[in-house]
Each structure stands twice: as structure tokens, then as C-alpha cells.
């Protein structure tokens, strides 16, 4: 049995956490060039009812026609046909000196809107402003419009002006419809981290095959705490999502190595 690895082409952390002053949130901050990806839920830091969340976005070369993309490699015979190969998303745990939550459950969902990786670095004070961030996936402007019947903009490749932030939900926009293979929705995956320091390793074959088939555009995955572990909130309509089934406990903090990590063999792979 042979193994082929695909490295991520973009990844970043997005957050609505407060800056060090505890007066403003870092919702406009970008961390696309940081060497760490971070997921957490923090309650009661700014005030008794405050909610702070962090999620990650990650994308792989799946549906393109250039060498090194999964679809192109299948056409070339480099990887087997659908049904004869499995795809696993793997993120490597990054040890740190902060608290580490046990028994946390992370969801892996397909993202439904384009986003930019960005070049921000600051994961402490959130001073690097840019996209993607908690409230915006990308910039408005001239972009290429790919052929797609679902999950994107119709039309042949060309240049057209469109607002890529339209419809963007703070915290990321994900496929949430019930999954009907080849027809509607995208699968969602979960993993439980009993000790907290485990790597993430999830079989995401179904999602990858949907992207290769062109059912939806490949905007990668979002990884975040399951809703019962993200903080309880009635929502504020802007920065904090409504979550009436959430937790009053904090889950702080889970970290993974990003694609810019100096530890080459700890970078995310598919």
C-alpha cells in the first residue's frame, strides 16, 4: 500500500477574542503567516458573560488541473480511482505552556465561501489587521469566477467584480445542509481528544471526492469545537454567534502546527 501526502496550500486562525486591553475584540485580525493554528472557547475573561472563540481554516490542492492537485493526479493515474483510495486530514499537536482541555470534541466542516490566507503573525495581541479574519473571508474586487453549479459563482473563468464578503457569517461560513452524497450538503466530521494532546486524524474521503467531482467548490475545511463545548451565548448579532446549547466552561487551548512551521514533518497534510 502506497501513501501520498498533499501539503496544505493555505491555513489561518480566526478569532473574536479580546485584545490584551480587554476593551476591543481582535475580530479584524489575521494570523495567516503564524506557525500555529489555534482552537479554543473562553468564557468570563472580560466579564462574567463574555465569550471568546478561536477557529481554524485550512485548504488543500484538491480540484485543480495542475500537477500536484488531487484531481489532476487522478487523471494522470498517479492516484487510484474513487473508491480505491482514502484521504485523511492530519494536523499535528503543538505542545504549549498554557492550559490544555481534556475530552474536547472538534468538528471538521467544509467551508462554503472563499477566503484568503493573509500574512498576519500576531496571535497574542491581534495587531495584524487583514483577511481572512472572524468577520471577513476575503476582499471585494475583481476575481476569477469558476464554473460551478453549487457553492460558488457560475460562469466560465474570467474577471468579474463581486463582493466575496457578501453572506459571510462571523466565525466562518460552512456547509450545514444534511449530506446527500453527490447531490446536496457536505459531510461533517468529529474527533474526540481524550487527553487533549492528540493529533487530529480524520478520514475526509467523502468531502474530497465531492470536491474532485465538482459537486461543490473546494474552499477547504474549518475546524472548531463542537457546539456543546463552544461557549453558551444568546449572540450579539455581530461578533458572537448565538449558541443556546453551549457550555459555561472554557476549553482553552488546543494548538496545531501550521503550514509555515519550521518543523517540516509537523505541517498539515492530507
What are these regions (language model features)?
Residues 1-269:
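Secreted, disulfide-rich extracellular signaling modules
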Amino acid at each position: 500500500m502506497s501513501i501520498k501526502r498533499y501539503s496544505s496550500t493555505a491555513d489561518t486562525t480566526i478569532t473574536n477574542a479580546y485584545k490584551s486591553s480587554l476593551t476591543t475584540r481582535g475580530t479584524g485580525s489575521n494570523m495567516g503567516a503564524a506557525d500555529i493554528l489555534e482552537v479554543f472557547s473562553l468564557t468570563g475573561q472580560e466579564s462574567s458573560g463574555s465569550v471568546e472563540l478561536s477557529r481554524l481554516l485550512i485548504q488543500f490542492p484538491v480540484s485543480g488541473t495542475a500537477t500536484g492537485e488531487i484531481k489532476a493526479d487522478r487523471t494522470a493515474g498517479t492516484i487510484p480511482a474513487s473508491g480505491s483510495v482514502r484521504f485523511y486530514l492530519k494536523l499535528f499537536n503543538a505542545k504549549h505552556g498554557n492550559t490544555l482541555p481534556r475530552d474536547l470534541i472538534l468538528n471538521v466542516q467544509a467551508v462554503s465561501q472563499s477566503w484568503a490566507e493573509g500574512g498576519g503573525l500576531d496571535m497574542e495581541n491581534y495587531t495584524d489587521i487583514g483577511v481572512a479574519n472572524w468577520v471577513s473571508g476575503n476582499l471585494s474586487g475583481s476575481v476569477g469566477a469558476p464554473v460551478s453549479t453549487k457553492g460558488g459563482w457560475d460562469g466560465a473563468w474570467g474577471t468579474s467584480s463581486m463582493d466575496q464578503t457578501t453572506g459571510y457569517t462571523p466565525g466562518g461560513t460552512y456547509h450545514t445542509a444534511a449530506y446527500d452524497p453527490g447531490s446536496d450538503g457536505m459531510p461533517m466530521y468529529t474527533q474526540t481528544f481524550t487527553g487533549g494532546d492528540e493529533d487530529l486524524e480524520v478520514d475526509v474521503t467523502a468531502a474530497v471526492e465531492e470536491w474532485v467531482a465538482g459537486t461543490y467548490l473546494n474552499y477547504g475545511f474549518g475546524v472548531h469545537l463542537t457546539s456543546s463545548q463552544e461557549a453558551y451565548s444568546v449572540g450579539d448579532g455581530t461578533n458572537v454567534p448565538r449558541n443556546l446549547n453551549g457550555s459555561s466552561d472554557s476549553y482553552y487551548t488546543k494548538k496545531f502546527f501550521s503550514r509555515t512551521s519550521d518543523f517540516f514533518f509537523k505541517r498539515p497534510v492530507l
